[in-house]
Regions:
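Rossmann-fold dinucleotide-binding core
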Residues: 14, 20, 25, 112-192
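Hydrophobic residues within alpha-helices
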Residues: 32-33, 121, 166, 207
Length: 335
């Protein structure tokens, strides 16, 4: 169920008046920050890679020398970082965000992180008179490029209304998931499901090849059937091409599904599949390296069978074909 967002005029007002700081210009962060810049936001960025920050400087953004400077000069501070430990460091170091934060500002955490870390850091933010929201994204790096990715927002409704004009610049579908921390749980839930799908697709494609069937035909059979999925329509294509490039690495998968497992263990849910997925990806990470593209988990079966799971006619990278547009709030249907 979709609801039209706040007016475009409100978004225009943000363009003219609000300074936004963005920390973390990695695979996803750079794309989200780029969407803000394209929409005319007064943006200041911070990243450890000087080449990346220079690209943003060339496109009109300002570059800060520390997270503290970002917090001091921005009204909204966005972080998009690779792990909970990095997020903690960026927030709590002597030159971190917390040292520059003040009353009335908003911290938006767009990293995939643990709910407990969101709560812990959020309390420190609130103690300074500022507000916070956890807003992880889902849908693949290719959709982040065009501003068509999905965004989950866990925060007070009042805070959500304040930041919605920014969120719809970065994402096509924006869902207010409830209180702070709720979005972080749903993010790792969706990543767990995507991981399970990737492993099952890998097994399906290798088994299909072993049975002597054409892989391009198998791709179409799955696509038009009950076995289809978002992961199949995207990641299967780069698997069959051989590039395996979806801008997402083994170590990030291990982090995300481990966070999901932590949630289940905390709530005393006796999962069976999740521990197996962690074992599979840790093995793949050890074999092929933590920075290997995650679809290369299929190499475990390619190595075991001697089969080459490639086919002609598939792209090396997934490109989002949907035109960029201002996003919308998604509203959960309730009686």
């Amino acid at each position: 169920m979709l609801r039209v967002t706040l007016s475009r005029q409100l978004s225009t007002d943000w363009n003219d008046s609000v300074k936004v700081g963005f920390i973390g210009l990695g695979n996803v962060g750079a794309k989200l920050a780029g969407s803000l810049l394209r929409n005319g936001i007064d943006l200041v960025v911070r990243d450890l890679d000087p080449a990346t920050t220079q690209q943003f400087r060339n496109s009109g953004a300002k570059v800060a020398q520390s997270p503290r400077e970002i917090a001091e000069t921005s009204e909204v501070i966005i972080t998009c970082l690779p792990s909970p430990s990095v997020s903690a460091s960026v927030m709590e170091d002597p030159d971190g965000v917390l040292t520059g934060l003040s009353e009335g500002k908003i911290w938006i955490e767009m990293s995939t992180t643990a709910q407990q870390e969101v709560f812990r850091l959020g309390k420190k933010v609130e103690a300074l008179g500022a507000s916070f929201a956890d807003c992880p994204v889902s849908g693949g790096c290719h959709r982040a490029t065009t501003g068509n990715i999905a965004i989950f927002a866990g925060c007070a409704r009042e805070v959500f209304e304040q930041i919605l004009p920014l969120l719809v610049m970065m994402g096509r579908h924006v869902l207010h998931t409830g209180d702070a921390g709720s979005a972080s749980i749903l993010k790792v839930v969706t990543n767990y499901l995507a991981t399970a799908n990737l492993v099952s697709i890998s097994e399906a494609l290798v088994t299909t090849k072993a049975a002597g069937l054409d892989l391009a035909t198998a791709y179409e059979a799955i696509r038009i059937s009950s076995g289809n999925s978002f992961v199949h329509e995207t990641e299967s294509q780069v698997i069959l091409n051989g590039s395996r490039d979806i801008n997402f690495t083994m170590d990030l998968v291990v982090k995300d599904i481990s966070l999901f497992q932590e949630v289940a263990e905390r709530e005393e849910v006796p999962l069976e599949l999740s521990p197996l997925l962690i074992k599979i990806f840790r093995d793949a990470e050890q074999r092929y390296g933590p920075r290997e593209w995650s679809p290369n988990v299929i190499r475990r079966l390619e190595d075991a069978t001697g089969l080459d799971i490639r086919a002609n006619g598939f792209p090396a990278q997934i490109i989002d074909q949907e035109p960029e547009a201002l996003g919308q709030e998604v509203v959960a249907a309730r009686d």
